[in-house]
Amino acid sequence: MTGAPSHATFPPAVILAGGLSSRMGRPKAGLVLGGRSMLTRVIERLRPQVAGIAINLNADPDPASAFGLEVVPDTIPGFVGPLAGILAAMRHTVRKSPGASHVLTVPVDTPLFPKSLAARLKTAITSGGEIAVAFSAGEMHPLFALWPVALADDLEAWIHADEKRRVRAFIARHESATVEFPLIPTAAGPLDPFFNINTPEELRQAEAWLPYLEDREP
């Protein structure tokens, strides 16, 4: 009989919460959505999918410490963007999970991501050096990806050499697999599970979607 996979076979994960939240005006991890913080929602959704969770955070560690998460700050100073958080995730994984070939990243501002995210991304990988990236409705979501930790040195060099530091541009330099996730059907219409919350208005929109999501999510 084949049992459920062990958590030892799941990838480790790092929640990306190291940005400045300039459009929101306050840290996103502590924002309340449907009575629970965004960080709480992301952890609850992520924990069954992965071997362990850390958080990339460059500010007040209190929200993370309440959950017992290890805080992984950027290793490159100056808030240079999400690639610095991805690099920190790779370096952390090499130190803490030496047997892991990849690390999963998810941003803290997208709390409705699929419950099948890690499993489907992992299934798409055919080689140790391949990046697996989530898509929905034909749109790439580059922060939802499985990253080969062996790319850490290359990524660090890219961050220092490329002025724009675009995540998509870094992915384009490497072998990658794409995984298309369906929209969530609801009574109010289809919802993109990668709907991200950058502004107070988008937070209100996410609140409006919550009543329609019960038992509808992939």
UniProtKB/Swiss-Prot annotation:
Its EC number is 2.7.7.77. GTP binds at residues 16-18, 28, 56, 74, 109. The keyword Protein biosynthesis does not apply. GO terms for biological process: bis(molybdopterin guanine dinucleotide)molybdenum biosynthetic process. It catalyses: Mo-molybdopterin + GTP + H(+) = Mo-molybdopterin guanine dinucleotide + diphosphate. Mg(2+) binds at residue 109. The N-terminal domain determines nucleotide recognition and specific binding, while the C-terminal domain determines the specific binding to the target protein. This is Molybdenum cofactor guanylyltransferase. It comes from Rhizobium meliloti (strain 1021). The gene is mobA.
